Amino acid sequence: MREVISIHVGQAGIQVGNACWELFCLEHGIQPDGQMPSDKTIGGGDDAFNTFFSETGAGKHVPRCVFLDLEPTVDDEVRTGTYRQLFHPEQLISGKEDAANNFARGHYTIGKEIVDLCLDRIRKLADQCTGLQGFLVFNSVGGGTGSGLGSLLLERLSVDYGKKSKLGFTVYPSPQVSTAVVEPYNSVLSTHSLLEHTDVAVMLDNEAVYDICRRNLDIERPTYTNLNRLIAQVISSLTASLRFDGALNVDVTEFQTNLVPYPRIHFMLSSYAPVISAEKAYHEQLSVAEITNSAFEPASMMAKCDPRHGKYMACCLMYRGDVVPKDVNAAVATIKTKRTIQFVDWCPTGFKCGINYQPPTVVPGGDLAKVMRAVCMISNSTAIAEVFSRIDHKFDLMYAKRAFVHWYVGEGMEEGEFSEAREDLAALEKDYEEVGIETAEGEGEEEGME
């Protein structure tokens, strides 16, 4: 089997995780107590969903995941929630005091005490796997736990499981909506290790997802539950081919191979279509061409950045439901003729497509309409550099005055780490700039380079 272990770190990671496992259970017909009436083989079995769930002798399906937080409240929601019987109590790890939005607490002082326990639990999960494929890590980089403990854990996973790929689903700070004053510090420090220790990072940001909920689902005041359910659909589409059988299946390492042209350039934009409320879906015919087009709309992007300001290097389209390869090819051909969607000149093909026959599932009573087909796009675009430059700018404003730095130094960090991380990100912005420069023809640009 090609198993995948999911690791949910900090409040954002756990809440997104909750939405994901709720959706995975619905997709596979697994009840909140872990029983799966449709599954006839007791024990292991070589079913496709075993990549994400392990089976006990009693026929109970247990998610291959751990939830980690430095304070108990968010973990307690899982312990008392609908799916409390689904998880093994040892999979929910929480500390006593939180990271207080401080990267240094999550990475050095408090995180250090809990990280070995986390790795033990992960080792137990890994030992149950016959062919571990890699890890999915869910966190946000604005807070203290997601950024600090998340980074620490990624660094340790690189040591313990060197060759295994790590995909990050990372919630980045939004341009307007902020949850903490020190977000820019935490994000820069955390991205520094995401650069080195993840193979692919999918960037999400709350504001972009809020806007999608407001605009497409007519939810006036979206809650985190609305946001997370939408994010869960994206993650479900990306992992559908690991959990179901389909025509063009895509495995975790295939993402890397097709999306990452250079090791550092691995921050992805994602979008999902159709995001549509039940009232509207009834009146619309959503063809493959239409959902493909809307996946490329700047407004569909799950991070606040405009792909029209950059060029695409590669792009993965994961279709699910009633889709045939012929329609996909036609839709992609149309996209290629559009002038607004530009690819870098050194990557002429640029598209990888996957098709999975399992139609999209929605949470009953949720906001999304049940549709016949959906597409999730994950793309590598030079425009993502906007997200970094925005955070870097905020970082610079605070760091010039050394504001709030004493909180980090007091937890055992050195001031040099700030400048080191900041330089790394400056280099990353430059990398993105260089990748987008025309190679052969642009004469004028060459002169500007010298």
From Swiss-Prot:
Question: What Gene3D superfamilies does this protein map onto?
Answer: Helix hairpin bin, Tubulin/FtsZ, C-terminal domain, Tubulin/FtsZ, GTPase domain
- PTM remark: Acetylation of alpha chains at Lys-40 stabilizes microtubules and affects affinity and processivity of microtubule motors. This modification has a role in multiple cellular functions, ranging from cell motility, cell cycle progression or cell differentiation to intracellular trafficking and signaling.
Annotated active site residues, numbered on this chain, are E254
Q: What is its main location?
A: cytoplasm
CDD domains noted in UniProt: alpha_tubulin
Q: Which cofactor does it need?
A: Mg(2+)
In this UniProt entry, the residues modified to N6-acetyllysine are: K40
- Protein's job: Tubulin is the major constituent of microtubules, a cylinder consisting of laterally associated linear protofilaments composed of alpha- and beta-tubulin heterodimers. Microtubules grow by the addition of GTP-tubulin dimers to the microtubule end, where a stabilizing cap forms. Below the cap, tubulin dimers are in GDP-bound state, owing to GTPase activity of alpha-tubulin.
Q: What is this protein called?
A: Tubulin alpha chain
